[in-house]
Amino acid sequence: MLLATFKLCAGSSYRHLRNMKGLRHQAVLAIGQELNRRTLGDSSPGWISQVRRRSSLLGSQLEAALYSEQELSYIQQGEVAMQKALSILSNQEGWKKENQQENGDEVLSKVVPDVGKVFRLEVVVDQPMDRLYAELVDRMEAMGEWNPNVKEIKVLQKIGKDTVITHELAAAAAGNLVGPRDFVSVRCAKRRGSTCVLAGIATHFGEMPEQSGVIRAEQGPTCMVLHPLAGSPSKTKFTWLLSIDLKGWLPKSIINQVLSQTQMEFANHLRKRLESSSASEARC
């Protein structure tokens, strides 16, 4: 019912509302608030509560400018993905340990109704949060330079200050048992107080059809959460919720191994990248 209402307000009635900017703003803002209210629970870790209390992606973006019907749809997809991912992270029950390293890095997993199996990476990075945010958001397209699991990331479209459509080409994995995949996703990034959330989910983008020789996989809902480590603001607590449908026929054991290992490797590659950039800045 809610999605039908959104379509009516932001889609089917677009021509009628295009000369009624104030009403159009109010309609979409109300829908954003209702999405938040229905998705969020009452009990969650402090950093999630902080983001939830102050997060209204639709509201903040629509106050800045008006968007096309398709752009509004992308914004809504990003908002729903963020709230769904935060809802999954806020539920502390049912997580099982998949992998743990001596330095404390760990990957947990659980099965979520209507989503499937999700993986949760928990690490502490010895770098300030702003450095991670800059690397993961501002320099997103450079990820292929330091993460061998990613061949390329391109921003296909930017919508406002928080939302982008991306195409990601992933390298083969598990000794080529898992061939190359690509993903088309809508991503949104929110900074609220001392917490940053980077969320995403698979979407359709007409200008990026499926590529020959590459399986189009789907992400989502997924998110990365960054916030200063309590008592050590120069360090960052990094949480990555990963939900992926790799498509194709693959044994579950292979999928579980690939995804948990991918998260562990990502943490190591990210640390090396940040250490390298810090050293370069120190020499300048």
Curated annotation (Swiss-Prot):
UniProt keywords, alphabetically: Lipid transport, Lipid-binding, Mitochondrion, Phosphoprotein, Steroidogenesis, Transit peptide, Transport
GO biological process, one term: steroid biosynthetic process
Modified residues (Phosphoserine): 56, 194
Domain of life assignment: Eukaryota
InterPro entries hit by this protein: StAR (IPR029866), StAR-like (IPR000799), START-like_dom_sf (IPR023393), START_lipid-bd_dom (IPR002913)
Pathway: Steroid metabolism; cholesterol metabolism
Span of domain START: 66-279
Localization per record: Mitochondrion
One GO CC term, this protein: mitochondrion
GO molecular function term, any single one: cholesterol transfer activity
Pfam family, one: START
Targeting signal (transit peptide) range: 1-62
Major site of localization recorded for this protein: mitochondrion
Gene3D superfamilies: 3.30.530.20
Function: Plays a key role in steroid hormone synthesis by enhancing the metabolism of cholesterol into pregnenolone. Mediates the transfer of cholesterol from the outer mitochondrial membrane to the inner mitochondrial membrane where it is cleaved to pregnenolone.
Assembly and interaction partners: May interact with TSPO.
Listed name of the protein: Steroidogenic acute regulatory protein, mitochondrial
Gene: STAR
